[in-house]
Amino acid sequence: MSEQNTFSSPEHITVLLHEAVDGLALKDKGIYIDGTFGRGGHSRLILSKLTENGRLIAIDRDPRAIAAAEEIQDSRFHIEHNSFSAIPYICEKLGLVGKIDGILLDLGVSSPQLDDAERGFSFMKDGPLDMRMDTSKGLSAAQWLQQVTEEDLAWVLKTFGEERFAKRIAHAIVNYNKSAVQNGTEPLTRTLPLAELIAQAVPFKDKHKHPATRSFQAIRIFINSELDELESVLHSALTVLAPEGRLSVISFHSLEDRMVKHFMRKQSKGESIPKGLPLREDQINRNRTLKVIGKAIQPKESEVFANPRSRSAVLRVAERIG
């Protein structure tokens, strides 16, 4: 068995496992946060590198991930059922604000979530149209689609899915649900009928991508407030990280990666200062909060071959200054 598989679960191959953990520059007695436990691949590798004085706090909003985390019997390990935007609250509760040596975030939907038809994330398997990361909170995708306006749905598809046929698809979905109400038939409550409706609404097909890919992504991102959560955790990392603490983030689509890249770049440059202004280096650096570490990392060919879902992954790492 490869070392990669040792730290991955049978149902989920952890993407950029060693690269993301190496990005944390682990201290054996450090305090770390795995903001997206999933099935614990990154967490288990981190724990294997910490001494008995090290500490790891893991977070996930998926009840099934929490169940998997509770199987880890380790006094250095603590699991929180929450979203990673709650990191400031969790750190304050545990007395760890400004003491965290590293935060790891593995964004997006996990393989177990995609592969479980009952979760409603996949357009390839028939299941209830749910899409919630935390199934105990909020509206399901089906409930939201039954009440959203055509204009708002088109905006979501365009903004979060970068879908060029957003208006056509939104019109088809809203029309279908309206007709169902009028005729006393069932509205869209399952994944495959939605995927088929989207495919019919799209005039041009991409032979490399299912026509429902962008729409499913957009609806999922909206239902789970994924980009709002990401923006929140990026800023809160500045508060909870210790000096020289690391932020290691894996993203899977351009919207996430763009947000991470721009945030790290902006925080590494600080506020713009007019040229020629006589300032000492410490004054110039005062507004810089992060230092970007290396270049963006993508999976090697061997990893993509073993796990095709890793193809779009991008890892970015930054270090807290001062």
From Swiss-Prot:
Its EC number is 2.1.1.199. Belongs to the methyltransferase superfamily. RsmH family. The gene is rsmH. GO terms for molecular function: rRNA (cytosine-N4-)-methyltransferase activity. It is an enzyme of class 2 (transferase). This is Ribosomal RNA small subunit methyltransferase H. It comes from Mannheimia succiniciproducens (strain KCTC 0769BP / MBEL55E). Keywords: Cytoplasm, Methyltransferase, rRNA processing, S-adenosyl-L-methionine, Transferase. InterPro entries: RsmH, SAM-dep_MeTrfase_MraW_recog, SAM-dependent_MTases_sf. It holds the Pfam family Methyltransf_5. One of its GO terms (cellular component) is cytoplasm. Its main location: cytoplasm.
